[in-house]
Every structure is written in C-alpha cells, then in structure tokens.
Amino acid sequence: MGRSLKKGPYIDPSVEKKILAMNEKGEKKVFKTWARDCTIFPEMVGHTIAVHNGKTHVPVYITEEMVGHKLGEFAPTRTFRGHGGDERSSRVR
C-alpha cells in the first residue's frame, strides 16, 4: 500500500539539502546516505548517491525513470545464491 496523496512524498531533509546545494554549485559529487526510505525527486536526476544496504554503500545513479520510487529499491539488501543445492547428484539412480 502506497503513501497517502494528502501527505505527499517523504523526502529526507539532509538528502534534499545536499542535492539542492550541489545543484546550485553545479557539482555532481557522490555522497553517502542511510535514508533508504527517501523518495527520489526530480532534482536528484543525474546525481549518484551511495545508499546503505545494511553492510556497504551501493552507488545508485539516478535516472528520470526512478523519480517517485524509494532509494532503497535500488540497493538490494540480500544476495541471491541460487535455488536449491546439489539435488541431482544426491538422488538415488
């Protein structure tokens, strides 16, 4: 279930402040954030943000298609190691 429209999107104040300051200066620096719940807003397009995945910071390049999504959606927290194990070799032939 999404967030209520009357509340508006959640934008982390520190992320917003850094992005707006970089846009004024014309910089494109990578900065770290732990705010996985921050909604991506249009001013972020073209920036790279290092989003924490619980272990490390994953660099996420923001494109126009990402606007409206959350930062955490692009920094996976779990590593997929494949389905099952050595099933075929353990079966009796």
UniProtKB/Swiss-Prot annotation:
InterPro entries: Ribosomal_uS19 (IPR002222), Ribosomal_uS19_bac-type (IPR005732), Ribosomal_uS19_CS (IPR020934), Ribosomal_uS19_SF (IPR023575). The keyword Ribosomal protein applies. It holds the Pfam family Ribosomal_S19. Keywords: Ribonucleoprotein, Ribosomal protein, RNA-binding, rRNA-binding. Gene3D superfamilies: 30s Ribosomal Protein S19, Chain A (3.30.860.10). GO terms for molecular function: rRNA binding; structural constituent of ribosome. One of its GO terms (cellular component) is small ribosomal subunit. GO terms for biological process: ribosomal small subunit assembly; translation. SUPFAM superfamilies: Ribosomal protein S19. NCBIfam families: rpsS_bact. Protein S19 forms a complex with S13 that binds strongly to the 16S ribosomal RNA. HAMAP family: Ribosomal_uS19. Belongs to the universal ribosomal protein uS19 family. PANTHER family: RIBOSOMAL PROTEIN S19P FAMILY MEMBER, SMALL RIBOSOMAL SUBUNIT PROTEIN US19M. This is Small ribosomal subunit protein uS19. The gene is rpsS.
